Amino acid sequence: MNNNQCQNHQDYLHNESYGLKYNLQNLNHQTLIFTENRPKESLNGQWHFSIDAYDTGLRAGWHQVRRHDEQGRPLPWDYDADGGELIPVPSCWNLFKPEYTYYEGSAWYAREFQYTAEAEGERVFLHIGAANYDAKIFVNGEFLGNHYGGSTPFTVEVTAKLGSKNLLQICVNNTRTLDRAPMRNTDWFNYGGIYRDVELYRLRPSFIKQCRVYLVPDNNYNQIQAEIEVDGGETGEVKLEIPELGLVQCGSVTEGKASITIQATPELWSPEHPRLYQVFAEYLGDRIELKVGFRQILVQGREILFNGKKIFLRGVSVHEDDVNLGKMVTEEDLRRRFEHIKELGGNFMRLAHYPHSEWVSEIADEVGIMLWEEIPVYWAIDFENAATYEDAQNQLLELITRDFNRASVIIWSVGNENADTDARLSFMTRLAQTAKKVDPSRLVSAACLVNNVKLKIEDRLTEALDIIGLNEYYGWYRPDYNDLERLGQNSKPEKPVIVSETGADCVAGMHGDVSELFTEEHMVDVYRHQVDFVKRFDYIQGMTPWLLYDFRTPRRINRFQQGFNLKGLIGADKQRKKQAFYVLQQFYLEKKKQEAASK
């Protein structure tokens, strides 16, 4: 007997397909809007919060907030949109209460806000910086869509749904599943919640949806390209201005897009001279402002050329993690990160293993630190699943869309430590091709593993990459340093290599013999061998050791780690430096001095 014939069927109790209608994934890179420097109204603050371990909210339709039947008689209810416990947004729920520390599942956020139109025909958009992982949006009881991806922004238009008083509900689910990027098995903490800003934007009926401005990467340094997409208009004219260059140029809009090419020779952005220009674009009264640096990053043989000159990437890897804030960041915390990298003598940072806060690239533009940005195609995701690819590609495109105008971003990474299978090769090659097609101004890489049978840098994916990322842990997971030497000798890459990960765990302040694991002395010994390795092989053009700060991860539970990966050059307090910090610092300052002398 089917459900229609079953006379005691209760949909909210018996329908296990309840989630299908809420899984549209319609909030994606195509719905993102340009928000930089636009006026906004913050919806941050105290929200009502309810854990929903059984997904009752979707099953029973909590967004409908029904407390009376059709005859007006009162009904019992299991959820209070306006009476749940209060939680700050942005934040991670894991740090809110001890019992939420390892919670994975759905949770409902709710708050009211007032709205009064300020201009005729204005359009209103809700923008969320990030929510981990599946976020479903409800406004005044109506489902507007959902977004996959725990680290990228998303936008939804709410214009037609608003009244004077409005109820916004967001159901966030951080459950790890096999068909997503990342999948169930990772090596970082699975924070849940809305942990970046929630904002409203009021826009004109026709507005600039996206604007990309860059220096054409043809090695001539004299041509600026602007690609502009508009919404609410198919034709018209876009005006582009760069006042400091005395430039004003217009372009025609055709089918919602305009392309403008300007002959100009701007001062170039570099780590030594992080020059940024104000750029303005205008369409039918909608005027936006960008800060853009102009630079070129190219590969020539085994060398990386930045603005035409060979460069060595003196970097370090970083997780988005804080013992007190989780994945939420503050400007103070981020600026401390950049100060530590500068103190190291660094010019480069690898943002692992997912898109970090957009503030990172904004500050990097300002202070002159180059960035490697990555999507969480991590370890053994389901490379044969079309839905998994769609998820990964969308996260890549959202990241590129968000950070396209950031001069500091020089590398898009399409994954980390993935086995060299046929399915993975096809999956990640397509991602690399997508990145190159959408963004010709940057390089593409991935963090690859060593061929441990041949002791060689060998991965079929490298054919699709501009730079080879190499993750190796000789001295730690593989204690024989002779194998590190053989790896270097056996490898004959035709492209530049970055040692994207290497290192060792160490308890800050714990001392012992150089052979004793988890001691300062052992970590120093690993770094000395690794620095010597990098010096000896000229195809290595950079390194981002693992990593700047210790971070939380449930995989690491021995007596020393106690829930933390301890490979940080600085402890989880982000203050106490380990001795290996100074080993790397000495190497980087030497490289920096050599580069300065060669210019």
Language-model-detected regions and their locations in the chain:
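Surface-exposed coil/turn segments at beta-strand junctions on protein surfaces, enriched
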Residues: 42, 102-104, 119, 149-151, ...
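Intrinsic-disorder/low-complexity, polar/charged segments enriched in Ser/Thr/Lys/Arg/Asp/Glu/Gln
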Residues: 42, 106-112, 123-125, 153, ...
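Substrate-binding/catalytic cleft of secreted carbohydrate-active enzymes
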Residues: 225-227, 338-339, 348-590
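Accessory carbohydrate-binding/adhesion or oligomerization-edge regions at the termini
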Residues: 1-94, 171, 177, 528
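Surface beta-strand/loop "capping" patches
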Residues: 205-232, 588-599
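Extended acidic/polar, glycine-enriched regions
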Residues: 161-165, 229-298
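Active-site-adjacent substrate/metal-binding segments within catalytic domains
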Residues: 85-115, 119-139, 145-148, 180, ...
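Accessory beta-strand-rich segments of carbohydrate-active enzymes
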Residues: 3-5, 14-19, 28-29, 34, ...
